Structures are given as structure tokens and as C-alpha cells.
């Protein structure tokens, strides 16, 4: 491949929605096909980075944990310098890097990624928060490149209707795509990967 900028994929969503589970699943599925690295954001610890290292998502030097302090959404939006610096470090450390996943700290529905930091944005919400979440809107729901509605297996337990979520997601997002997933079993993962590869114009190769 010619030397070019890595595709930066932002992964956002509320606390507990499945962002780190998605990051782990993507790393495991794509690490033999692409040259990849990860930046995670946590408020005061590198907990998500440690989780990914512990679960052998990638080699430890391919994962940088950024401690944002204060409001995690500031570090991905208003002042993304700490994340941009981590991305630069990874690009220098691994020439020919093809994908960098940037996982935000737990944030609210109003948080979005700065265009400086992310080429593609995935926003993860989960069914256990109730079927009203899509209609609450916010930039993550309405403007992300792909909305991932995770933990669909919990719908019967929390009395959430996937039909309602489907209808509201279509209404709030217009033409923008969304996917139902259960990352615990891998349901929806192939579609998420296909989206990243297609939108990111990626060409897989054997590792």
C-alpha cells in the first residue's frame, strides 16, 4: 500500500453501551487483515486500554489510553489535541497504519467527534436503556455515520420494542444507516465491519 493517512474511526456512546466490547470485537476480527491501533479515552484511568490489553485485542504498544480528566466529550470535540497527539504517536510508531479506532469516554447523547479527529463515526446505544433512546436524538443518534443499537437480546427483559427503535431510528436518521447488534454473540459485527471497509475504502490483505 502507498503511504497514506490511517482511517480514523470514532466509537462513541453512553457509559455501558458496549463501546469497548465493539472495539475489542473489531480488533480481533480485523487485526490479521489490516495494520491497526487504538486510542481509548477514560476520565481518570486507562481502564478501557487495560481491558483491551488484558483481552489481547492487539499488542500493548498498539493501544494508547488517554486520561481526559473532567468532561470526556471535550477531549473528542472542543479540544481534541490530547487525542490527536496519541494518533500522531501511533502513526509514527507504526508506519503504514491503516485503521486507528478512537474510543470516546462514556458520554451523553450530545457528544460528537471533531472532524479533525475522526473520519468515520460509530455511535453505540443499548436496548437496556429503553426503546425511547433513538427518539431522544442528539448528534450521536442523528449525525453519526453508523448507529449501532446493541444488546438486542435484553429487549424482552426490559420491555423494549425493537420495532419502535427501528421506526424511531429511521425517523431520526433519515438515510443514515443503523444496525441492531448483540456483540456478546457477534450478531451484527459482520455488517459493522462491511460498513467500515466500504465507507473507509479499505482493501483487506492477509496478515
UniProtKB/Swiss-Prot annotation:
Coiled-coil stretches: none
InterPro entries named in the record: CobW/HypB/UreG_nucleotide-bd, P-loop_NTPase, UreG
Keyword terms, alphabetized: Chaperone, Cytoplasm, GTP-binding, Nickel insertion, Nucleotide-binding
Protein name as it appears in the record: Urease accessory protein UreG
Origin: domain of life: Bacteria
Cell compartment(s), UniProt: Cytoplasm
Native source organism of the sequence: Azoarcus sp. (strain BH72)
UniProt subunit comment: Homodimer. UreD, UreF and UreG form a complex that acts as a GTP-hydrolysis-dependent molecular chaperone, activating the urease apoprotein by helping to assemble the nickel containing metallocenter of UreC. The UreE protein probably delivers the nickel.
Pfam short name (any one): cobW
One GO term (biological process): urea catabolic process
Gene Ontology CC terms, in alphabetical order: cytoplasm
PANTHER family to which the protein is assigned, alphabetical: UREASE ACCESSORY PROTEIN G
Binding site for GTP: 13-20
One of the record's GO molecular function terms: GTPase activity
The family this protein is said to belong to: Belongs to the SIMIBI class G3E GTPase family. UreG subfamily.
Role noted for this protein: Facilitates the functional incorporation of the urease nickel metallocenter. This process requires GTP hydrolysis, probably effectuated by UreG.
